[in-house]
Protein backbone atom coordinates (compact mmCIF):
# COMPACT_ATOMS: atom_id res chain seq x y z
CA UNK A 1 0.00 0.00 0.00
CA UNK A 2 1.44 3.36 -1.02
CA UNK A 3 1.12 6.61 0.89
CA UNK A 4 -1.07 8.34 -1.70
CA UNK A 5 -3.74 5.67 -1.24
CA UNK A 6 -4.00 6.74 2.38
CA UNK A 7 -4.79 10.38 1.47
CA UNK A 8 -8.50 11.19 1.76
CA UNK A 9 -9.83 14.36 0.11
CA UNK A 10 -12.71 16.08 1.91
CA UNK A 11 -13.95 17.74 -1.30
CA UNK A 12 -14.05 14.66 -3.53
CA UNK A 13 -14.81 12.16 -0.80
CA UNK A 14 -12.11 9.87 -2.20
CA UNK A 15 -9.27 8.14 -0.43
CA UNK A 16 -6.46 7.88 -2.94
CA UNK A 17 -6.08 9.49 -6.35
CA UNK A 18 -9.33 10.88 -7.73
CA UNK A 19 -8.22 11.00 -11.35
CA UNK A 20 -9.79 13.36 -13.86
CA UNK A 21 -13.45 12.43 -13.36
CA UNK A 22 -15.44 11.68 -10.23
CA UNK A 23 -18.48 10.45 -12.18
CA UNK A 24 -18.22 8.57 -15.46
CA UNK A 25 -19.75 5.63 -17.28
CA UNK A 26 -17.44 2.66 -17.75
CA UNK A 27 -17.71 -0.68 -19.53
CA UNK A 28 -15.75 -3.57 -18.05
CA UNK A 29 -16.94 -6.05 -20.65
CA UNK A 30 -14.40 -7.36 -23.14
CA UNK A 31 -15.20 -6.14 -26.66
CA UNK A 32 -17.09 -8.66 -28.74
CA UNK A 33 -15.16 -10.14 -31.62
CA UNK A 34 -16.67 -8.36 -34.58
CA UNK A 35 -13.90 -9.06 -37.07
CA UNK A 36 -13.00 -12.25 -38.90
CA UNK A 37 -9.29 -12.44 -39.69
CA UNK A 38 -8.26 -14.76 -42.52
CA UNK A 39 -4.59 -15.72 -42.45
CA UNK A 40 -3.77 -17.24 -45.84
CA UNK A 41 -0.50 -19.12 -45.64
CA UNK A 42 1.50 -22.23 -46.51
CA UNK A 43 3.75 -24.48 -44.39
CA UNK A 44 6.86 -23.69 -46.49
CA UNK A 45 6.23 -19.95 -46.91
CA UNK A 46 9.44 -18.34 -45.62
CA UNK A 47 7.90 -14.90 -45.17
CA UNK A 48 5.13 -16.50 -43.11
CA UNK A 49 7.84 -17.90 -40.84
CA UNK A 50 9.38 -14.42 -40.65
CA UNK A 51 5.97 -13.03 -39.64
CA UNK A 52 5.57 -15.36 -36.64
CA UNK A 53 6.89 -12.92 -33.99
CA UNK A 54 4.67 -10.05 -35.17
CA UNK A 55 1.58 -12.21 -35.69
CA UNK A 56 1.91 -13.65 -32.18
CA UNK A 57 2.19 -10.16 -30.69
CA UNK A 58 -0.82 -9.01 -32.70
CA UNK A 59 -2.86 -11.92 -31.36
CA UNK A 60 -1.62 -11.50 -27.80
CA UNK A 61 -2.41 -7.79 -27.68
CA UNK A 62 -5.44 -7.45 -29.97
CA UNK A 63 -6.89 -10.95 -30.28
CA UNK A 64 -9.95 -9.86 -28.30
CA UNK A 65 -11.11 -7.95 -31.38
CA UNK A 66 -11.02 -10.73 -33.96
CA UNK A 67 -11.52 -14.42 -34.68
CA UNK A 68 -8.60 -15.91 -36.59
CA UNK A 69 -9.07 -18.46 -39.37
CA UNK A 70 -6.02 -20.02 -40.98
CA UNK A 71 -6.42 -20.84 -44.66
CA UNK A 72 -3.97 -22.97 -46.63
CA UNK A 73 -3.06 -21.29 -49.92
CA UNK A 74 -1.07 -23.92 -51.82
CA UNK A 75 2.44 -22.65 -52.55
CA UNK A 76 3.96 -25.72 -54.22
CA UNK A 77 1.98 -28.61 -55.68
CA UNK A 78 5.06 -30.15 -57.31
CA UNK A 79 8.23 -29.13 -59.11
CA UNK A 80 6.92 -30.39 -62.44
CA UNK A 81 6.59 -27.27 -64.55
CA UNK A 82 7.04 -24.95 -61.56
CA UNK A 83 8.93 -21.69 -62.07
CA UNK A 84 9.04 -18.43 -60.11
CA UNK A 85 10.83 -16.32 -62.68
CA UNK A 86 10.49 -13.07 -60.72
CA UNK A 87 12.49 -14.54 -57.83
CA UNK A 88 14.87 -16.59 -59.97
CA UNK A 89 13.49 -19.93 -58.81
CA UNK A 90 13.27 -22.71 -61.36
CA UNK A 91 14.50 -25.69 -59.35
CA UNK A 92 14.64 -26.73 -55.67
CA UNK A 93 18.26 -25.67 -55.20
CA UNK A 94 17.33 -22.10 -56.16
CA UNK A 95 15.20 -21.82 -53.00
CA UNK A 96 18.09 -22.29 -50.56
CA UNK A 97 19.65 -18.85 -51.01
CA UNK A 98 16.27 -17.13 -50.93
CA UNK A 99 15.40 -18.84 -47.66
CA UNK A 100 18.72 -17.98 -46.03
CA UNK A 101 18.28 -14.35 -47.05
CA UNK A 102 14.83 -14.21 -45.44
CA UNK A 103 16.17 -15.90 -42.30
CA UNK A 104 19.09 -13.51 -41.94
CA UNK A 105 16.90 -10.47 -42.50
CA UNK A 106 14.12 -11.54 -40.12
CA UNK A 107 16.33 -13.35 -37.57
CA UNK A 108 13.89 -16.24 -37.58
CA UNK A 109 16.44 -19.00 -38.27
CA UNK A 110 16.28 -20.72 -41.64
CA UNK A 111 18.79 -23.35 -42.70
CA UNK A 112 17.59 -24.09 -46.23
CA UNK A 113 20.28 -26.60 -47.18
CA UNK A 114 17.65 -29.34 -47.56
CA UNK A 115 16.79 -27.77 -50.92
CA UNK A 116 20.10 -29.10 -52.23
CA UNK A 117 19.91 -32.69 -51.02
CA UNK A 118 16.42 -33.50 -49.68
CA UNK A 119 13.98 -30.96 -51.14
CA UNK A 120 10.33 -30.62 -50.21
CA UNK A 121 8.55 -31.90 -53.32
CA UNK A 122 5.12 -30.53 -52.38
CA UNK A 123 3.70 -28.26 -49.70
CA UNK A 124 0.26 -29.74 -50.35
CA UNK A 125 1.22 -32.85 -48.34
CA UNK A 126 1.75 -31.12 -44.95
CA UNK A 127 -1.17 -28.81 -45.78
CA UNK A 128 -3.50 -31.81 -46.06
CA UNK A 129 -2.22 -33.17 -42.75
CA UNK A 130 -2.97 -29.77 -41.22
CA UNK A 131 -6.55 -29.98 -42.49
CA UNK A 132 -7.08 -33.46 -41.04
CA UNK A 133 -5.71 -32.38 -37.65
CA UNK A 134 -7.93 -29.30 -37.82
CA UNK A 135 -10.98 -31.54 -38.14
CA UNK A 136 -10.12 -32.97 -34.72
CA UNK A 137 -8.88 -29.87 -32.91
CA UNK A 138 -8.34 -26.30 -34.14
CA UNK A 139 -5.66 -25.48 -31.58
CA UNK A 140 -3.75 -28.69 -32.26
CA UNK A 141 -3.81 -27.81 -35.96
CA UNK A 142 -2.16 -24.49 -35.21
CA UNK A 143 0.41 -26.28 -33.07
CA UNK A 144 1.03 -28.73 -35.90
CA UNK A 145 1.66 -25.87 -38.33
CA UNK A 146 4.11 -24.28 -35.91
CA UNK A 147 5.97 -27.58 -35.34
CA UNK A 148 6.11 -28.23 -39.07
CA UNK A 149 7.64 -24.80 -39.64
CA UNK A 150 10.17 -25.27 -36.88
CA UNK A 151 11.11 -28.58 -38.49
CA UNK A 152 11.52 -27.36 -42.05
CA UNK A 153 12.99 -23.90 -41.47
CA UNK A 154 15.19 -24.14 -38.38
CA UNK A 155 15.93 -27.86 -38.17
CA UNK A 156 16.13 -28.59 -41.89
CA UNK A 157 13.65 -31.49 -42.01
CA UNK A 158 11.62 -32.39 -45.08
CA UNK A 159 8.00 -31.93 -43.98
CA UNK A 160 6.70 -33.63 -47.11
CA UNK A 161 8.32 -36.83 -45.82
CA UNK A 162 5.84 -39.26 -44.29
CA UNK A 163 8.01 -40.23 -41.31
CA UNK A 164 8.71 -36.59 -40.42
CA UNK A 165 4.99 -35.80 -40.50
CA UNK A 166 4.09 -38.86 -38.44
CA UNK A 167 6.60 -37.83 -35.79
CA UNK A 168 5.26 -34.27 -35.61
CA UNK A 169 1.65 -35.46 -35.28
CA UNK A 170 2.61 -38.07 -32.68
CA UNK A 171 4.13 -35.30 -30.56
CA UNK A 172 0.71 -33.65 -30.51
CA UNK A 173 -0.67 -36.73 -28.75
CA UNK A 174 -2.48 -37.94 -31.88
CA UNK A 175 -2.06 -41.05 -34.03
CA UNK A 176 0.44 -39.78 -36.55
CA UNK A 177 0.36 -42.76 -38.86
CA UNK A 178 -3.45 -42.78 -39.07
CA UNK A 179 -3.70 -39.04 -39.68
CA UNK A 180 -0.98 -38.92 -42.34
CA UNK A 181 -2.67 -41.79 -44.17
CA UNK A 182 -6.08 -40.14 -43.92
CA UNK A 183 -4.63 -36.91 -45.31
CA UNK A 184 -3.87 -38.67 -48.60
CA UNK A 185 -7.38 -40.04 -48.98
CA UNK A 186 -10.22 -38.22 -50.74
CA UNK A 187 -11.21 -36.34 -47.59
CA UNK A 188 -7.80 -34.72 -47.21
CA UNK A 189 -7.80 -33.56 -50.82
CA UNK A 190 -11.35 -32.20 -50.56
CA UNK A 191 -10.63 -30.26 -47.37
CA UNK A 192 -7.54 -28.66 -48.87
CA UNK A 193 -9.39 -27.83 -52.08
CA UNK A 194 -11.98 -26.00 -49.96
CA UNK A 195 -9.20 -23.84 -48.52
CA UNK A 196 -7.87 -23.12 -52.00
CA UNK A 197 -11.35 -22.07 -53.12
CA UNK A 198 -11.66 -19.75 -50.14
CA UNK A 199 -8.25 -18.22 -50.84
CA UNK A 200 -9.31 -17.56 -54.43
CA UNK A 201 -12.60 -16.02 -53.30
CA UNK A 202 -10.60 -13.68 -51.07
CA UNK A 203 -8.47 -12.65 -54.03
CA UNK A 204 -5.25 -13.99 -52.53
CA UNK A 205 -2.26 -14.56 -54.80
CA UNK A 206 0.75 -14.38 -52.48
CA UNK A 207 1.61 -15.37 -48.92
CA UNK A 208 1.32 -14.34 -46.22
CA UNK A 209 -1.91 -12.45 -46.78
CA UNK A 210 -4.07 -11.27 -43.91
CA UNK A 211 -7.62 -10.16 -44.61
CA UNK A 212 -9.79 -8.64 -41.90
CA UNK A 213 -13.54 -8.57 -42.56
CA UNK A 214 -16.17 -6.84 -40.39
CA UNK A 215 -19.86 -7.56 -39.86
CA UNK A 216 -20.76 -5.42 -42.88
CA UNK A 217 -18.54 -7.68 -45.00
CA UNK A 218 -16.07 -4.86 -45.61
CA UNK A 219 -12.46 -5.91 -45.58
CA UNK A 220 -8.84 -4.83 -45.36
CA UNK A 221 -6.14 -6.86 -47.11
CA UNK A 222 -2.49 -6.78 -46.02
CA UNK A 223 -0.07 -8.69 -48.23
CA UNK A 224 3.41 -9.77 -47.16
CA UNK A 225 5.23 -9.81 -43.84
CA UNK A 226 4.67 -6.34 -42.38
CA UNK A 227 5.39 -4.52 -39.09
CA UNK A 228 2.84 -4.71 -36.28
CA UNK A 229 1.61 -1.18 -37.00
CA UNK A 230 0.16 -2.28 -40.34
CA UNK A 231 -2.09 -4.86 -38.71
CA UNK A 232 -3.17 -2.58 -35.87
CA UNK A 233 -4.01 0.18 -38.35
CA UNK A 234 -5.94 -2.28 -40.51
CA UNK A 235 -7.90 -3.51 -37.50
CA UNK A 236 -8.73 0.05 -36.41
CA UNK A 237 -9.87 0.85 -39.93
CA UNK A 238 -12.13 -2.17 -40.25
CA UNK A 239 -13.62 -1.59 -36.79
CA UNK A 240 -14.30 2.02 -37.75
CA UNK A 241 -12.93 3.35 -34.49
CA UNK A 242 -11.38 6.75 -33.94
CA UNK A 243 -10.06 5.74 -30.53
CA UNK A 244 -6.83 3.73 -30.16
CA UNK A 245 -7.46 0.03 -29.60
CA UNK A 246 -6.83 -1.33 -26.12
CA UNK A 247 -3.73 -3.52 -26.20
CA UNK A 248 -3.83 -6.39 -23.73
CA UNK A 249 -0.76 -7.36 -21.73
CA UNK A 250 0.92 -10.42 -23.27
CA UNK A 251 1.07 -13.65 -21.31
CA UNK A 252 4.12 -14.06 -19.10
CA UNK A 253 7.12 -15.74 -20.69
CA UNK A 254 6.64 -18.73 -18.40
CA UNK A 255 3.04 -19.24 -19.51
CA UNK A 256 3.91 -18.64 -23.14
CA UNK A 257 6.69 -21.24 -23.09
CA UNK A 258 4.36 -23.74 -21.43
CA UNK A 259 1.96 -23.23 -24.32
CA UNK A 260 4.42 -23.01 -27.22
CA UNK A 261 7.19 -25.37 -26.15
CA UNK A 262 9.88 -23.50 -28.10
CA UNK A 263 10.57 -19.80 -28.59
CA UNK A 264 13.30 -18.06 -30.54
CA UNK A 265 15.06 -14.96 -29.26
CA UNK A 266 13.50 -12.77 -31.93
CA UNK A 267 10.01 -13.81 -30.84
CA UNK A 268 10.75 -12.90 -27.23
CA UNK A 269 12.26 -9.56 -28.27
CA UNK A 270 9.24 -8.57 -30.35
CA UNK A 271 6.59 -9.68 -27.88
CA UNK A 272 8.13 -8.05 -24.82
CA UNK A 273 9.79 -5.03 -26.51
CA UNK A 274 13.34 -6.09 -25.69
CA UNK A 275 16.73 -5.57 -27.27
CA UNK A 276 18.59 -8.72 -28.22
CA UNK A 277 21.14 -8.25 -25.42
CA UNK A 278 18.33 -8.09 -22.83
CA UNK A 279 16.80 -11.47 -23.65
CA UNK A 280 19.08 -13.67 -21.54
CA UNK A 281 18.47 -11.74 -18.31
CA UNK A 282 14.74 -11.49 -19.11
CA UNK A 283 14.52 -15.27 -19.45
CA UNK A 284 16.46 -15.79 -16.23
CA UNK A 285 14.16 -13.44 -14.33
CA UNK A 286 10.96 -14.98 -15.67
CA UNK A 287 11.61 -18.71 -15.75
CA UNK A 288 13.37 -21.12 -13.42
CA UNK A 289 16.41 -22.79 -14.98
CA UNK A 290 14.75 -26.11 -14.09
CA UNK A 291 11.95 -25.39 -16.57
CA UNK A 292 13.83 -24.64 -19.79
CA UNK A 293 16.90 -25.37 -21.87
CA UNK A 294 18.76 -22.64 -23.72
CA UNK A 295 20.23 -23.56 -27.11
CA UNK A 296 21.45 -21.89 -30.28
CA UNK A 297 20.95 -22.58 -33.97
CA UNK A 298 22.28 -20.63 -36.94
CA UNK A 299 23.51 -17.96 -34.56
CA UNK A 300 20.11 -17.46 -32.93
CA UNK A 301 19.29 -18.37 -29.33
CA UNK A 302 16.12 -20.24 -28.46
CA UNK A 303 14.55 -21.81 -25.39
CA UNK A 304 12.77 -25.15 -25.11
CA UNK A 305 10.42 -26.24 -22.36
CA UNK A 306 11.84 -29.14 -20.34
What are the residue ranges of the model-derived segments?
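C-terminal cap of thioredoxin/glutaredoxin-like
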Residues: 4-15, 52-58, 150-306
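A short beta-strand-turn-helix
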Residues: 18-35
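Short, structurally constrained coil/turn elements
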Residues: 31, 62-64, 288
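Short active-site neighborhood of thiol/selenol oxidoreductases, capturing the structured segment around
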Residues: 31-46, 52-55, 68-72
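An acidic- and aromatic-residue-enriched active-site/binding cleft used to recognize and process polar
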Residues: 42, 73-75, 215, 225
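A short acidic (Asp/Glu
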Residues: 49, 80-83, 221-224
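Structural alpha/beta surface segment adjacent to cysteine/selenocysteine redox centers
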Residues: 52-153, 265
Amino acid sequence: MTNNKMVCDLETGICGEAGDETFETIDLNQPQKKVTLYYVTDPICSHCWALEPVLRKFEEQYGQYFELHTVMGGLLESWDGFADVANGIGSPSDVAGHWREVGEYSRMPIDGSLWHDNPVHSSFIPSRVYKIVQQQDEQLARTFLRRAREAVFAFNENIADELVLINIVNQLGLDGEAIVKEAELTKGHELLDQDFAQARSLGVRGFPTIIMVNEENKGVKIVGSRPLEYYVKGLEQILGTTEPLQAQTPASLKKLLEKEGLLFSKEIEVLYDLEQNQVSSFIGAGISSDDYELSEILGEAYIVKK
